[in-house]
């Protein structure tokens, strides 16, 4: 299920020419277009070193139906690995050049880290079973192009590196060129992120068999609650994975969050491993 990258770029680049709702602004606490990563990055704050959220930031206590001990068999604690783990995601972005191709554009970088921590495994010194490091460099446009009741908010094109930072035989990594499109319609948000794998994938040559060539994300705001779903799927092989989430505000800055992941590819070490994981915890920022 490959696609023409050049054709996709040719389709997307003209979008930046449409009238823009989000442009470079000097703000203090005024919210950007809700749900728009690019509109948020275009806002200038008093502190020039302000970091912005990219993906969601959360901390969960989780339990999985099955643990991939075979993939970590070279770890001296593998046989004692537990099914309950603390899972957290840290995801931040920083604008490098606002207005690089007009007031609605930004050149930016992001860093996302996901970890699976055997916190309760005190007999083995509470090791981190897996951590994935995902830096990106991207060009983003905030738009207000409307079609069929939907408003295209974000157009983003960039380079993504994803690695677990391990050496052989547990090393996993891949590099991708990607495009991210996000549109809103009332309380609905839909985001699609197709990618094209570049470079070597010797540590995981069949990763697209399980992870496919895109990620689809859907969000719905129900009162103060946010319902979310995202996943990736390879239509040729029938493999994929999906994540469901619900968050609700506890305080102004913290949300209660519960998450279920089922399928392949929850982490890089588990890209070809099928499991179901349930987690409960807190979140700092959701889709909206």
Segments from the language model and where they lie:
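Outer-membrane pore/translocation modules
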Residues: 65-75, 82, 97-220, 231, ...
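Cleavable N-terminal export/targeting peptides
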Residues: 1-42, 288
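Intrinsically disordered, low-complexity linker/tail regions enriched in polar/charged residues
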Residues: 20-24, 163, 198-200, 228, ...
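Membrane-embedded beta-strand positions in outer-membrane beta-barrel channels/transporters
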Residues: 85, 89-91, 134-136, 178, ...
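Conserved, mostly hydrophobic/aromatic
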Residues: 92, 258
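A subset of solvent-exposed loop/turn segments in beta-rich extracellular surface proteins, enriched
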Residues: 22-73, 129-131
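Glycine/small-residue-rich hydrophobic helix-like segments
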Residues: 224-254
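Outer-membrane beta-barrel "beta-signal"
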Residues: 274-288
């Amino acid at each position: 299920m490959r696609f023409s990258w050049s054709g996709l770029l040719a389709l997307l680049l003209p979008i930046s020419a449409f009238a823009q709702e989000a442009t470079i602004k000097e703000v203090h606490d005024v919210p950007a277009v809700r749900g728009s990563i690019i509109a948020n990055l275009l806002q200038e704050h008093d502190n020039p070193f302000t970091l912005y959220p990219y993906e969601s930031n959360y901390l969960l206590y989780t339990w999985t139906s099955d643990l991939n001990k075979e993939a970590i068999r070279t770890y001296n604690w593998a046989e004692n690995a537990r099914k309950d783990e603390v899972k957290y995601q840290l995801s931040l972005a920083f604008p490098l050049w606002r207005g690089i191709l007009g007031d609605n554009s930004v050149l930016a970088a992001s860093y996302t880290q996901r970890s699976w921590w055997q916190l309760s495994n005190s007999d083995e010194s509470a090791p981190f079973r897996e951590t994935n490091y995902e830096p990106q460099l991207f060009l983003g446009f905030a738009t207000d192009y409307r079609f069929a009741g939907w408003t295209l908010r974000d157009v983003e094109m960039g380079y993504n590196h994803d690695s677990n930072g391990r050496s052989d035989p547990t090393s996993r990594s891949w590099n991708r060129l990607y495009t991210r499109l996000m549109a809103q319609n009332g309380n609905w948000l839909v985001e699609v992120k197709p990618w094209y794998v570049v470079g070597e994938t010797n540590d995981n040559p069949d990763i697209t068999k399980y992870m496919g060539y895109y990620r689809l994300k859907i969000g719905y705001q129900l009162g103060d609650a946010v319902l979310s779903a995202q996943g990736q799927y390879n239509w040729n092989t029938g493999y994929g994975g999906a994540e469901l989430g619900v968050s609700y505000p506890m305080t102004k800055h913290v949300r209660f969050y519960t998450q279920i992941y089922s399928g392949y590819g929850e982490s890089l070490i588990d890209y070809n491993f099928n499991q179901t994981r349930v987690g409960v915890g807190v979140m700092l920022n959701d889709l909206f």
